[in-house]
């Protein structure tokens, strides 16, 4: 039987009188890569914040590894669109913040996994945007997470760096077998990376599609079919 990593049942989230998430039901097996897509304001980032316990649900049930938790779970790590590195700490010391007991060996191994060990003694300000995000990823992975939450971490990167980061994230996921939830506005990115794409619509699940394409993925006609189906769903209200 598949072990369920994340279980959401009738999950709701209100901000004042505004209902952002409405009766969301999702079961995510351990090790699955899930992408969340949809219009701005549909509840994608709010859902990640609930799973990370940065926010509390208004009602419903949220289980991580079969348990209902009230505090931030150290086995869940969050990567934001901004790298959020401390400018007064070296690259290595930034990564150590994510490691248990700030262990230097673990931090160096994590930096090596993102191909930045040679930058361990540098300051964040001299790094490129892509390098900063790789350091942020290394910091998250230094905590040996079971669940990695990615909130548009590639959105501000140039096209080439974005492709490189996609390949890096995929290779680390395949190697380390953690569960991933990726929020992205890029449907092509979602289909390229995810086992499963969930489209939110006005705070509810509108589409939940498995992507059974072999890896490494090629952007052929089969890829395009999934991409077009998801895009058509998201854009259906804009068609005249």
UniProtKB/Swiss-Prot annotation:
Pfam family for this entry, one: ABC_tran
EC number: 7.6.2.14
InterPro entries: AAA+_ATPase, ABC_transporter-like_ATP-bd, ABC_transporter-like_CS, ABC_transporter_ATP-bind, P-loop_NTPase
Enzyme class, spelled out: translocase
GO MF term (any one): ATP hydrolysis activity
The protein, known as: Aliphatic sulfonates import ATP-binding protein SsuB
Keyword Ribosomal protein: no
Reported function: Part of the ABC transporter complex SsuABC involved in aliphatic sulfonates import. Responsible for energy coupling to the transport system.
SMART domains given in the database record: AAA (SM00382)
Subcellular location field: Cell inner membrane
Listed Gene3D superfamilies: P-loop containing nucleotide triphosphate hydrolases (3.40.50.300)
Mode of membrane association: Peripheral membrane protein
SUPFAM superfamilies per record: P-loop containing nucleoside triphosphate hydrolases
Organism: Zymomonas mobilis subsp. mobilis (strain ATCC 31821 / ZM4 / CP4)
Assembly and interaction partners: The complex is composed of two ATP-binding proteins (SsuB), two transmembrane proteins (SsuC) and a solute-binding protein (SsuA).
Catalytic activity, as annotated: ATP + H2O + aliphatic sulfonate-[sulfonate-binding protein]Side 1 = ADP + phosphate + aliphatic sulfonateSide 2 + [sulfonate-binding protein]Side 1
Residues of the ABC transporter domain: 6-227
Residues bound to ATP: 38-45
Keyword entries, A-Z: ATP-binding, Cell inner membrane, Cell membrane, Membrane, Nucleotide-binding, Translocase, Transport
Record PANTHER family: ALIPHATIC SULFONATES IMPORT ATP-BINDING PROTEIN SSUB, TAURINE IMPORT ATP-BINDING PROTEIN-RELATED
Signal peptide bounds: none
Predominant location: membrane
